[in-house]
Amino acid sequence: MTISISDLRKDYRQQSLSETEVDPNPLQQFQTWFKQAIEAEILEPNAMTLATLSREGKPAARIVLLKEVDDRGFTFFTNYKSRKGEELAHDPWAALVFWWAELERQVRIEGSVSQVSAADSDRYFSSRPWGSRLGAWASEQSKAITGREVLEQNLRALEQEYRDREVPRPPHWGGYRLSPTLIEFWQGRPNRLHDRLCYRLQGDQWQLERLSP
């Protein structure tokens, strides 16, 4: 059976999005949508695409998990020596995208990124499962290795080392917070005439505008 990619399409008809319905604060609006994504039992609603830039201006994107959102922004955790960590150290601006297909919704976010405090990183790290804490030590993220056995050998050694004591947070592992300057809410609509409401930070105030699809 031959599948024509160009024929793959879906007409979105679930909901609409109007300026009169949304919260004047986009972070509060995100919280509303995020709660609805959880209630819809979407698989990993906190999964988001993180896009960064290399020194040469080449983009890279990957899925990471949102671990906290508040009025300060969107927090995730990773290895500071990974490719994304190195790129954020060079250019601390990034973009996030959430895609909730079951709700026919997308949220796009742009902003500056900074490391969270060591205390915040310690607090989250200590909440992780034991194996995940060991994994943060076992893997030199984004580095080439000769085979999976390297990781498994590292893990076995760490299991012995920390069998009877707490696993500390590696100094090269911790959190980042993206402080948004732009948040766009996208709701799929019929005939590709989607609703797009975009908040832009002007000074300390959020300005809302509708974008043409």
UniProtKB/Swiss-Prot annotation:
A GO term, aspect molecular function: FMN binding
Domain of life: Bacteria
Transmembrane segments: none
Residues annotated to bind substrate: R9, K10, D11, Y12, K67, Y124, R128, S132, R192, L193, H194
EC number of the protein: 1.4.3.5
Cofactor note as given: Binds 1 FMN per subunit.
HAMAP family reported for this sequence: PdxH
Subunit field text: Homodimer.
PANTHER family named in the record: PYRIDOXINE-5'-PHOSPHATE OXIDASE (PTHR10851:SF0), PYRIDOXINE-5-PHOSPHATE OXIDASE (PTHR10851)
NCBIfam families: pdxH (TIGR00558), PRK05679.1 (NF004231)
Protein name: Pyridoxine/pyridoxamine 5'-phosphate oxidase
Organism lineage string: Bacteria, Bacillati, Cyanobacteriota, Cyanophyceae, Gomontiellales
